[in-house]
Regions:
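Conserved, mostly hydrophobic/aromatic
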Residues: 3, 65, 86, 124, ...
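Metal- or metallocofactor-binding catalytic centers and their adjacent structured scaffolds
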Residues: 45-46, 61-135
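Hydrophobic faces of well-ordered beta-strands that scaffold small-molecule active sites
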Residues: 68-70, 150-157, 172-174, 205-211, ...
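Shared catalytic-loop signature of beta/alpha-barrel
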Residues: 80, 225, 231, 242-261, ...
Length: 398
């Protein structure tokens, strides 16, 4: 079966109306530091990164009309890569040859792999896997080895901890309000933040902190030592992804909690270096950023052979991450990102066919492909003529 067309699209899903019984979730109030936050005219509070653009989708159609869908980040920047660079490379080729197609796209990007190009590759690869599952009549998790567990254990990311506990979660990741240039006052604020979280979730719950690349080695070591009494399950992405030597030093020095990183590492080669250097105890590829499912499977193999666990970034909230975690033995849990209001059903912002968390677990759809059930009239072509400029929100801390 040949690929007939590859197109970038967007999903025009109807928006869910807010209920008077809900209140705004952590994305609207939690102070979170990011690398750009060292400059006070950039926000530290909104859920999106300053300058980020909306997600886009890839629609791959086979000769018989069957289609697959996959999504990717940095949509407005990467959409042209899909339509004008990748599409003509793979149209007319075997739709089931996911390994060949992944390798073709990867080799075609020599010289500009990573970042925007790899995000575009992610969407194409996911759409191809979705199409492959549909053509073969199998869920994707069956195509990558079959289920290794009955359900995927989840940890919830957010600061609405009481609500998250009420929903049945027992594993939690909280935000980081501290950027290293704030000095000892900011560090004290962070310690108080973690102490409150530990008090709410209890001593037996898993608790994790995500600094989002906001530290240097010195501050990361000081933070890890100050937070030692609160028994973090892991310390996530304290440094920028390019600081391999910094991660090596941190992992050598921090022995009381696991070190995790990887969501901003792109493609197998970046992870090969990370794993070979044993620079982390847990790696966290994002399937929509790092090259898709094909790349993530290669990354998993590197890590598994080295005794390093793979827990995908945002994996529990996406169909692709759910299928991956169900199938891979050394992927003990997945991340459920809390993007709904407090009191709002978790499924309200999910697309049809994406499984919803229940009691801290999720069971992926067993429908062919990734199980997406998106109405065709929601799928509209990407409008390249309507490119919007990135939005940089003013700081709410000024």
């Amino acid at each position: 079966m040949k690929i007939k067309s590859v197109r970038c699209v967007q999903i025009d899903a109807p928006e869910t109306e807010s209920s008077p019984d809900t209140r705004p979730g952590w994305n609207t109030y939690a102070t979170r530091s990011q690398p750009i936050a060292r400059y006070t005219d950039f926000t530290r509070v909104d859920g999106g990164k300053p300058g980020s653009t909306k997600k886009a989708w890839v629609h791959v159609t086979a000769e018989d009309g069957t289609f697959g869908l996959g999504s990717f980040a940095h949509g407005q920047l990467a959409a042209s890569v899909v339509d004008y660079f990748i599409a003509p490379l793979i149209e007319g080729r075997d739709a089931l040859a996911t390994e060949l197609l992944n390798d073709l796209v990867w080799r075609s990007q020599e010289g500009f792999q990573g970042g925007i190009a790899t995000a575009a590759q992610s969407g194409v690869d996911l759409a191809l896997w979705d199409l492959k599952g549909k053509l073969l009549g199998k869920p994707v998790y069956e195509l990558i080895g079959g289920p290794s567990r009955q359900a995927v254990e989840l940890y919830a990311t957010g600061d609405d901890l009481e609500w998250m506990k009420e929903l049945g979660f027992t594993r939690f990741k909280i935000s980081n309000p501290f950027f290293y240039e704030e000095g000892s006052e900011g560090l004290t604020k962070l310690v108080e933040h973690v102490a409150r979280a530990r008090e709410i979730v209890g001593d037996e719950a898993e608790l994790t902190l995500n600094p989002v690349m906001s530290f240097n080695v010195d501050i990361a070591l000081r933070v890890a030592e100050r937070l030692r009494p609160y028994k973090l399950r892991w310390f996530e992405e304290p440094l920028p992804p390019w600081d391999l030597q910094g991660y090596i030093e941190l992992n050598r020095c921090i022995t009381w909690t696991a070190l995790a990183t990887g969501e901003h590492h792109y493609g197998r080669k970046a992870f090969q270096q990370l794993v070979a250097a044993r620079a982390a105890d847990i790696i966290q590829p994002d399937i929509e950023w790092t090259g898709g499912l094909s790349e993530t499977l290669k990354i998993y193999t590197y890590a598994e052979a080295a005794g390093i666990e793979t827990i995908t970034h945002m994996g529990g909230s996406t169909a692709w991450g759910q299928h991956f975690a169900l199938a891979m033995p050394e992927s003990s849990q997945a991340e459920w990102f809390m993007n709904t209001d407090v009191g709002q059903p978790l499924g309200d912002k999910l697309l049809p066919g994406v499984a919803t968390a229940k009691g801290g677990k999720v069971v992926p759809s067993d429908a062919p492909g990734f199980g997406l059930e998106i109405p065709e009239d929601w799928i509209v072509p990407w409008d390249h003529s309507n490119q919007a400029r990135a939005v940089y929100l003013p700081s709410q801390n000024q």
